[in-house]
Amino acid sequence: MVKVYAPASSANMSVGFDVLGAAVTPVDGALLGDVVTVEAAETFSLNNLGRFADKLPSEPRENIVYQCWERFCLELGKQIPVAMTLEKNMPIGSGLGSSACSVVAALMAMNEHCGKPLNDTRLLALMGELEGRISGSIHYDNVAPCFLGGMQLMIEENDIISQQVPGFDEWLWVLAYPGIKVSTAEARAILPAQYRRQDCIAHGRHLAGFIHACYSRQPELAAKLMKDVIAEPYRERLLPGFRQARQAVAEIGAVASGISGSGPTLFALCDKPDTAQRVADWLGKNYLQNQEGFVHICRLDTAGARVLEN
């Protein structure tokens, strides 16, 4: 039996639309991510467990884990009879890389079960392909950090899909999921087809400056450059209370905040534990909309997807 855990991730990070993402893990030790188990069997089967299992498609072939198994078999050119179990701990349409968690855990578990016939680059390419079936287009800003860990910059040149960018140990990521769903496809459809020249220049300046600040170890500058002129001005209308929440967390002391992925999760970066706790308390009382919502104080997950049992 192989059991693989794949962590949540926060894509875009305001400054890097479709090209930046960070894997995150709660500081209290909770597992914020999906778990997939693979066991040898006579025929294929898939069982769904976990807090959000009831939100998965009722038709098994529509389940992305089934599609991962099917695509992996096609890649190897043979049917692999296994019993798969998906522990769905991540809310769907949350902006926390929920589909990436399932895809990464499923493909990594299949690869481990079969003795690692695929290298990490090929496996990551498959992960992007499968996740793209849900989001509507291939982009790696969730699957890359989820699989490899840390903060990842998408490269997609010279057979390199992504490379790690150094983060800051003092940063605490407060993630608040309000309990509503925002479809990635819907959130992409709301974006304009063309952008003004000054917005393109500002975006390039912010992203280049952010990467420079990370490598030159300037956390204050990096946080200051986490601005979004590409997606947030258009997507915030999908997120009730988002603008007020951003203003509130800034007043409390967050050094940066924005939409995690395509939302509705809000991320707030803090550089002190007491500030992070006050931000988390405010968001828990004011940004969550129902019982399915939650707030976690996290750090970068530098390990990425990992085998829990083998």
From Swiss-Prot:
Highest taxon in the source lineage: Bacteria
The record's Gene Ontology cellular component field reads:
cytoplasm
Binding locations of ATP: P91, I92, G93, S94, G95, L96, G97, S98, S99, A100, C101
Main location group: cytoplasm
Which reaction does this enzyme catalyse, per its entry?
L-homoserine + ATP = O-phospho-L-homoserine + ADP + H(+)
| EC class name | transferase
Provide a GO biological process annotation.
threonine biosynthetic process
Q: What is its EC number?
A: 2.7.1.39
**Subcellular location(s) per record:** Cytoplasm
Q: Which GO terms describe its molecular function?
A: ATP binding; homoserine kinase activity
- Alphabetically ordered keywords of this record: Amino-acid biosynthesis, ATP-binding, Cytoplasm, Kinase, Nucleotide-binding, Threonine biosynthesis, Transferase
Pathway annotation: Amino-acid biosynthesis; L-threonine biosynthesis; L-threonine from L-aspartate: step 4/5
Q: Which PROSITE patterns match?
A: GHMP_KINASES_ATP (PS00627)
Q: Which residues cross the membrane?
A: none
Instruction: Tell me any Pfam family this protein matches.
Output: GHMP_kinases_N
In UniProt terms, what function does this protein have? Catalyzes the ATP-dependent phosphorylation of L-homoserine to L-homoserine phosphate.
Into which family does the record put it? Belongs to the GHMP kinase family. Homoserine kinase subfamily.
* HAMAP family named among the record's database cross-references: Homoser_kinase (MF_00384)
Q: What protein name applies here?
A: Homoserine kinase
From which source organism is this entry? Answer: Shigella sonnei (strain Ss046)
Q: What is the lineage of its organism?
A: Bacteria, Pseudomonadati, Pseudomonadota, Gammaproteobacteria, Enterobacterales
